[in-house]
């Protein structure tokens, strides 16, 4: 199919004209879709060991590694409000001459954007890419959720992630092939390594992509997903050339309980690092000229109850435990040993696309030395999906 500038402009004009009542338009053999949501988050957070800096991402949503630890007498409460989770996406689906369909999607939001925004005058923030991919005949090329992650297992929460320390959570460039219940991918590699003194090195020196495999079972009662990951951790700095093989497996799913549902995930691995817990535990420790991968176990369980057609609640528990080598503590400092959180919310949708909600979250983080800290957060949100 050939696209002329006139047809392209016509498609854009039609989408704009329909934006208040519809979110798809078809020009020739191509269907254009547009969607997203606007969301306001207002949060009151009380930290036992003092609040993170105002520029910390942990002030926008719960990130376990940013939870402060230390003196309980440093309790500090802060209030934050933003609309940075708001997002929009644009997609196409084109029927080709061979009878197959090629699809594209791009989605952006405003979280974690580069410096440039501020809260003094304009509160302006740059957009960032969440998804940008092409799919054709079982293949996917581009950036989207890792094949190692089951996005469908994430519970409904007001916090951006929800079970932050307990879930696999990665978006990255990849080549993925899906056939039936199976999917396999080659994904962008990256390593987070603890160096002497507790510093962190983020390296991109792997000679091989990360490899994942996934099996999905769907049934009337819900679904069950098993995923596996194999990757190469590397550190090539200052004359050191070290690498280590890392493995992990994750099981997750959703069980229907009438109108309610139960969602869960359990992940175990060696050197998982950035793949779980928003990188609260690193992938490996530099031990001389070698890398020692860090074992970790993480997971969550969430129950959602529908009070009626407009009101619902999610009750969530999430955890991560890292098995740090105690013999190396003197060299790489005092890393995170465990992180956990629990939350409960109440959500009200007077109409399908509009949601008002309140959520309470309690989170804890403990270092290997026993030093710890906690946070209590009360969050109010309003969201309209379009």
Residues of each region from the PLM?
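Gram-negative bacterial Sec-dependent N-terminal signal peptides
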Residues: 1-24
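Transmembrane beta-barrel strand/turn architecture of Gram-negative outer membrane proteins
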Residues: 24-34, 103-106, 227-231, 243-257, ...
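Outer membrane beta-barrel
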Residues: 25-55, 63-65, 69-193, 205-208, ...
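Outer-membrane beta-barrel translocator domains and adjoining extracellular loop/strand segments
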Residues: 48-53, 115-124, 151-160, 190-207, ...
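Transmembrane beta-barrel outer-membrane domains
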Residues: 79-83, 122-129, 166-170, 204-208, ...
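Transmembrane beta-strand segments that form the barrel wall of outer-membrane beta-barrel proteins
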Residues: 103-112, 182-188, 224-232, 312-321, ...
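Detector for outer-membrane/organellar transmembrane beta-barrel domains
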Residues: 219-336
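Outer-membrane beta-barrel "beta-signal"
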Residues: 348-350, 354, 374-386
């Amino acid at each position: 199919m050939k696209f002329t500038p006139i047809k392209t402009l016509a498609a854009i004009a039609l989408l704009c004209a329909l934006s208040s009542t519809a979110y798809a338009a078809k020009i020739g053999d191509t269907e254009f879709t547009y969607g997203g949501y606007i969301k306001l988050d207002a949060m009151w957070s009380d930290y036992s060991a003092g609040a993170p800096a105002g520029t910390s991402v942990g002030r926008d949503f719960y990130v376990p590694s940013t939870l402060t630890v230390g003196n309980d007498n440093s309790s500090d409460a802060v209030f934050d409000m933003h609309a940075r989770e708001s997002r929009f996406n644009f997609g196409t689906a084109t029927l080709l001459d061979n009878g197959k369909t090629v699809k594209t999607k791009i989605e952006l939001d405003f979280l974690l954007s580069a410096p440039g925004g501020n809260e003094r005058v304009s509160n302006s923030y740059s957009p960032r890419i969440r998804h940008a991919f092409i799919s054709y005949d079982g293949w996917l090329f581009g950036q989207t959720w890792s094949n190692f992650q089951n996005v469908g297992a994430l519970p409904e929460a007001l916090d951006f992630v929800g079970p932050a320390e307990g879930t696999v959570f990665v978006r990255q460039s990849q080549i993925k092939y899906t056939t039936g219940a199976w999917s396999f991918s080659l994904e962008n590699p990256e390593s987070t390594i603890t160096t002497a003194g507790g510093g962190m090195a983020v390296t991109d020196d792997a000679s091989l992509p990360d490899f994942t495999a996934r099996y999905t079972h769907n049934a009337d009662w819900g679904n069950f997903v098993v995923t596996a990951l194999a990757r190469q951790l590397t550190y090539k700095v200052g004359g050191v050339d070290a690498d280590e093989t890392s493995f992990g497996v994750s099981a997750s799913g959703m069980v229907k309980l009438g109108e309610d549902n139960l969602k869960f995930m359990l992940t175990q691995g060696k050197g998982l690092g950035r793949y779980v817990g928003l990188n609260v535990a690193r992938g490996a420790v530099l031990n001389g000229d070698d890398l020692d991968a860090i074992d970790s176990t993480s997971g969550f369980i969430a129950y959602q109850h529908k009070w009626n057609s407009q009101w619902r609640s999610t009750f969530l528990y999430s955890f991560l435990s890292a098995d740090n080598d105690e013999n190396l503590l003197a060299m790489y400092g005092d890393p995170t040993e465990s992180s956990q959180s629990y939350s409960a919310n109440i959500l009200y949708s007077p109409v399908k696309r509009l949601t008002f909600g309140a959520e309470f979250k309690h989170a804890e983080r403990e270092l290997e030395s026993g030093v710890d800290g906690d946070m209590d957060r009360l969050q109010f949100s309003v969201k309209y999906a379009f």
